[in-house]
A protein has these predicted regions:
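Beta-rich catalytic cores
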Residues: 1, 25, 53-55, 76, ...
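Gly/Ser/Thr/Pro-enriched helix-cap/hinge segments flanking short amphipathic alpha-helices
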Residues: 145-147, 163, 167-277
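A short loop-to-beta-strand structural motif that recurs across blades of beta-propeller domains
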Residues: 28-30, 79-81, 130-132, 181-182
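Hydrophobic beta-strand segments that make up the repeating blades of beta-propeller
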Residues: 16-20, 67-74, 120-125, 170-175, ...
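Beta-propeller blade termini
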Residues: 1-10, 31, 54-64, 105-115, ...
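Blade-edge motifs of beta-propeller repeat domains
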Residues: 16, 30-52, 82-103, 133-153, ...
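Acidic Asp/Glu-based divalent-cation binding sites
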Residues: 11, 15, 36, 69, ...
Length: 277
């Protein structure tokens, strides 16, 4: 019921995580060999033992260690997998505070709602959806009531984007048998940087590219994929910079293999980067 493309082992090729909705099933990890073929690496990745009826998935670098992690929503309990950078995963739901029973969750989205440089987690479910703030210490805190995303509804999926162009990410939630919901984010004070790619040798939208933004507080990574699970996502990649007035560097690893680095990039702008020919 949901899948994520991404470069999970850092070799520059887009792999696939594909969970199964059947009871007792595994999360399949298909490794791209760079020659147009995918190979089953599920057992090596240690994702085969999920045993959960999965509805959705979100991928993002929640611990800012430079690789893509994965969160699975399930009627049997949610699972957060931390990637070691080689495509081997450890299940860390309990130690991060996400092992609590949350009901029959449907979908999830990683996004930095408070622009502090850490990816937070929005979980869609029947009733009231949940927003967990990343505390920056490897744990998450439920801030649903605090930030005002506690409207009830039978949510199915969510997408995050800055619809009002005010420098923070808003939420659009798709609801089954009801009105869809748009939550405008008004409470963010941190600096930000949005990156839009224009491919020349690569595809025009830069799908498959990896963007690395470094500030004094560390490294953030995004990959341009365009969608996950049941939803599309914006191609513009958004980074919260906290109190940093500039990014020390912005590095783009294009699907063509070309690497571009820009230095001392000012905050609070949409940075358009065209791939060098």
């Amino acid at each position: 019921h949901g899948a994520c493309f991404g470069d999970f082992n850092g070799d520059g090729h887009i792999d696939l995580l594909a969970p199964d909705a059947a009871r007792g099933s595994r999360m399949n990890f298909l490794l791209n060999d760079g020659r147009g073929r995918f190979h089953d690496s599920t057992r090596r990745s240690k994702t085969w033992h999920t045993q959960a009826r999965t509805h959705g998935m979100a991928c993002g670098d929640f611990d800012n260690d430079g690789d893509l992690d994965a969160f699975l929503t399930s009627r049997d309990g949610n699972l957060l997998f931390a990637n070691d950078g080689t495509g081997v995963f450890a299940e860390v739901s309990e130690k991060t505070g996400l092992a609590q029973p949350l009901g029959d969750t449907k979908a999830a989205a990683f996004f930095d709602y408070d622009n502090d440089g850490d990816l937070d987690l929005y979980i869609v479910r029947p009733g009231i959806d949940l927003l967990f703030r990343n505390e920056g210490d490897g744990t998450f805190k439920d801030v649903t009531e605090e930030v005002g995303v506690n409207d009830p509804g039978d949510g199915k999926s969510a997408s995050c984007f800055d619809y009002d162009n005010d420098g923070d990410l808003d939420l659009y939630v798709v609801v089954h048998n009801g009105m869809n919901r748009l939550f405008r984010n008004d409470g963010t004070t941190g600096n930000w940087l949005a990156v839009k790619l224009l491919g020349t040798r690569s595809n025009r939208d830069g799908i498959g590219a990896r963007i690395e933004v470094r500030t004094g507080s560390g490294l953030q990574v995004r990959e341009v994929i365009g969608g996950k699970g049941h939803m599309q996502d914006p191609l513009v990649q958004f980074f919260g910079l906290g109190q940093a007035s500039a990014a020390e560097s912005v590095t783009i690893r294009w699907p063509s293999g070309r690497v571009q680095t820009l230095r001392s990039v000012e905050a609070n702008q949409v940075l358009v980067v065209e791939e060098k020919a």
